[in-house]
């Protein structure tokens, strides 16, 4: 028990008690080691121990949290500075800057309900402070009218009484030195549902700030506000009919029941309140606050409402938990996300890459075609002489002058005496006459595959006249069109067999192949030699 006028740490003299809470007491004291004997605030913190001996990990954690408070106070003018910290026996002490001024609770008691303009100025003055601590992954967890002081010197809102040390001191320590659970602190009514469950998020601070603004506008604490039984949303506008639409919209979103429906950052809330999306300075807190009554007043730093303690599991061996009260800051997003400048820079680059890739692929394909030209078309042309079998009936044309050899099928080879190959070109009709009997000659092409060496000249079928050899059907390529008349020949040959009845005479040897083909009708005329015999 600390008594007034007692020196703490042989240096700080207690002037009066400012308040008591679940975690200890708050005193107003003087620093006797300073020439000015400046006033300071001393927080006496009592850990929850079941063992009289303080475990070493708790001392280390208290040291880390004190270092965090020191860093915050030194880098932001709207957060009290930490002068010192020490421990005596089983208790811990923090020595902080004294802020002359009024808490929002005291200011409301003096002035009554705030106007919309005054509340907007207050929010724009405190939101940069919240953004500052949230960027360092710290959650205040106990924002309420008692923990915001309007500084007497300039009227700026000062954020006090961070919950980080309270959470450390609220850790229950078992007799074996281990922690049974940690506490989730906050003030009933100002505490969001997820914070009451021991899982505070950054928007939990915005929820508490929204309820603080409602208190300043209506004079009602959260316990006296009605809510929608279906959605859980707070119904407060009927108590502040003169509130501006913009401010009302901002407060409504800040106090949404579900964290995902609130602002994802203090910056977003400030920008919406200002009605634009310009960047709001988050570290200077240069917005003028609501000026309070003239004259020097002292600020009571103790909370007027009790702080709720909720047990949540905690691992005492987690030496990395410098800020165990914080969580991963996933809700914060930069306002310059998706800058149009980046789109104009990235899109042309993507288009150029696509075009360049297409051109490179085209060059590669053409180079491959040049290096590996497709096979020459000559091969299919060489195969074109397929009509050779249809040309083979040509040798039968030469045999036509002597249809008698038809019975002597084995002697077709000597018959190709027709040296007058040129005549073959002029008598396609005659060809049609004789093929009647050459049908068996179709069997001959199989034994006459000797022309196989000749397919090379077949590429140019015109030189047919050069082929005088009976075996080589070189002239065959020229009459390539003749194969079509072949099917028509059989019906025309039917009249020819009549003269063949008189043909059995010896004339074949008398009339060698020297006779011209145009005299093919000679067989019927052959009766003339018969006349002399009759004579």
UniProtKB/Swiss-Prot annotation:
The keyword Repeat does not apply. It is an enzyme of class 2 (transferase). Residues 422-435 have a biased composition (Low complexity). Gene3D superfamilies: Phosphorylase Kinase, domain 1, Transferase(Phosphotransferase) domain 1. Residues 371-535 are annotated as: Disordered. SMART domains: S_TKc. Keywords: ATP-binding, Kinase, Nucleotide-binding, Serine/threonine-protein kinase, Transferase. Residues 12-277 form the Protein kinase domain. Its EC number is 2.7.11.1. The active site is at 142 (proton acceptor). One of its GO terms (molecular function) is ATP binding. It comes from the Bacteria. The keyword Kinase applies. It catalyses: L-seryl-[protein] + ATP = O-phospho-L-seryl-[protein] + ADP + H(+); L-threonyl-[protein] + ATP = O-phospho-L-threonyl-[protein] + ADP + H(+). Residues 402-421, 446-464, 472-498 have a biased composition (Pro residues). It holds the Pfam family Pkinase. ATP binds at residues 18-26, 43. Belongs to the protein kinase superfamily. Ser/Thr protein kinase family. PANTHER family: SERINE/THREONINE PROTEIN KINASE, SERINE_THREONINE KINASE LIKE DOMAIN CONTAINING 1. This is Serine/threonine-protein kinase C. It comes from Synechocystis sp. (strain ATCC 27184 / PCC 6803 / Kazusa). The lineage of its organism: Bacteria, Bacillati, Cyanobacteriota, Cyanophyceae, Synechococcales.
